[in-house]
C-alpha cells in the first residue's frame, strides 16, 4: 500500500540533514546520529527494546538475496523470536554467491554470543542449508539446541548400522508418529530424528526431516517457527520497507541501512503489538475471521502517520520505547 511503499522514503528523509519535513524528522535525525552503528551495539539495543535482555532466546537463521540497483547482495541473517514474530538481530554480507559455509555462521553467531552469552540461547532453527557436522558440534559445545532440517539422503548410525533418515521417518509414519525415542549417531553427536511426508507445490511427495541433539516433544511446532524469518524478509523486501528500491552500492552503507531497517522493523512490530493488545478487534475481519491487517502493517501505518502529520502526541507515543525505558 501507499504507507508501506513510502517507508524507505521516510527513513531516507529522516537521515537527510537538508530535510525540512518537520520537527519529528529532526528529532529522529538526532536519535539516528547518536547510534553507534556497529552490529554488536545494535544487537544489544534491539534486545533491550524488546525487553529480552535475560533470554531465553529462540534464534532463526536464514540467507536471502537482495538487489540494490545493479548490485546483488547475499545476506546471512540471524533473527530472534519475539511474541511469535521474527526480529533481525545480526547479519553479514557474504562476498560470494550461493550458500553460507560453517565459518560464515560461526562468525555471525559469535557476535551474538559475545553480547548475550550462549547460555541464554535456547534454540537455533534453520533449513537444509544450515547443516554440517562441525556446525552441529559448535552449537552443541556452546550448549545451544539446534533444530535443523536435513536432506532426505542423509545417513545416521544406530547400533553401528548406517540408516537413512528418510527410512526412519517412513517407519515412524507407519506407526502414526513424527518421531521416536531412539538416539542416533551423527558424527560424534547423539541426535534425534523427526519428520513427516507432505505434498509439495508440484504435488510430489517430499519429506521434512529434522535433526536435534535434544528430545523435543513438539519439535515440528518448534521448527515451524522458522517461517517467521521468511515473513520478515518479505516485509523488508516489498510489503514494508522496499529495500530493493534503494540504490546504495557500498557495502558499509548497505550494512548501515540494514541496521536502520532492523531498528525500524523492531519499532513497528512493537508498536503494532501494542495496538493489537489495546484494540484486538481491529485485526479481525468479521466476514471470514482472518486478520484484516498484520501487526507489522498496523505499527508501520501508525508511525508513518505520526511522522508525516507532525502530530507531537502520536510521535511521542511512537518513540516511547526508543529510550529503552
Predicted feature residues:
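Short, basic interhelical loop/turn and adjoining N-cap
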Residues: 14-27
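Single, function-defining residue in the core of a domain
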Residues: 1-8, 19, 42-44, 53-57, ...
Amino acid at each position: 500500500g501507499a504507507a508501506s511503499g513510502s517507508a524507505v522514503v521516510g527513513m531516507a528523509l529522516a537521515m537527510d540533514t537538508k530535510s525540512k519535513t518537520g520537527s519529528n524528522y529532526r528529532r529522529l535525525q538526532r536519535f539516528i546520529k547518536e547510534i553507534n552503528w556497529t552490529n554488536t551495539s545494535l544487537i544489544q539495543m534491539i534486545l533491550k527494546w524488546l525487553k529480552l535482555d535475560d533470554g531465553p532466546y529462540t534464534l532463526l537463521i536464514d540467507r536471502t538475496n537482495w538487489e540494490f540497483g545493479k548490485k546483488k547482495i547475499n545476506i546471512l541473517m540471524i533473527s530472534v523470536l519475539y511474541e511469535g514474530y521474527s526480529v533481525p538481530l545480526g547479519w553479514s554480507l557474504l562476498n560470494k554467491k550461493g550458500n553460507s559455509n560453517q565459518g560464515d555462521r560461526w562468525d555471525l553467531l559469535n557476535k551474538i554470543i559475545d553480547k548475550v552469552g550462549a547460555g541464554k540461547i535456547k534454540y537455533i532453527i534453520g533449513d537444509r542449508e544450515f547443516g554440517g557436522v562441525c556446525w552441529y558440534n559448535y552449537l552443541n559445545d556452546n550448549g545451544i539446541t539446534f533444530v535443523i532440517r536435513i536432506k532426505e539422503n542423509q545417513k545416521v548410525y544406530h547400533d553401528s548400522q548406517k540408516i537413512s533418515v528418510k527410512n526412519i521417518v517412513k517407519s515412524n509414519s507407519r506407526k502414526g508418529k513424527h518421531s521416536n525415542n531412539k538416539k542416533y549417531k551423527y558424527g560424534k553427536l547423539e541426535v534425534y530424528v523427526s519428520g513427516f511426508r507432505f505434498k509439495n507445490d508440484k504435488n510430489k511427495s517430499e519429506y521434512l526431516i529434522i535433526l536435534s541433539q535434544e528430545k523435543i516433544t513438539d519439535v515440528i511446532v518448534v521448527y515451524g517457527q522458522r517461517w517467521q524469518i521468511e515473513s520478515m524478509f518479505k516485509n523488508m523486501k516489498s510489503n514494508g520497507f522496499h529495500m530493493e528500491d534503494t540504490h546504495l552500492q557500498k557495502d558499509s552503507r548497505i550494512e548501515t541501512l540494514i541496521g536502520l531497517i532492523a531498528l525500524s522493523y523492531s519499532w513497528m512490530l512493537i508498536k503494532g503489538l501494542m495496538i493489537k493488545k489495546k484494540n484486538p478487534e481491529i485485526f479481525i475481519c468479521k466476514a471470514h475471521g482472518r486478520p484484516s491487517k498484520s501487526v507489522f502493517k498496523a505499527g508501520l501505518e501508525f508511525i508513518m502517520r505520526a511522522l508525516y502529520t507532525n502530530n507531537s502526541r502520536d510521535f511521542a507515543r511512537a518513540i516511547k520505547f526508543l529510550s529503552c525505558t
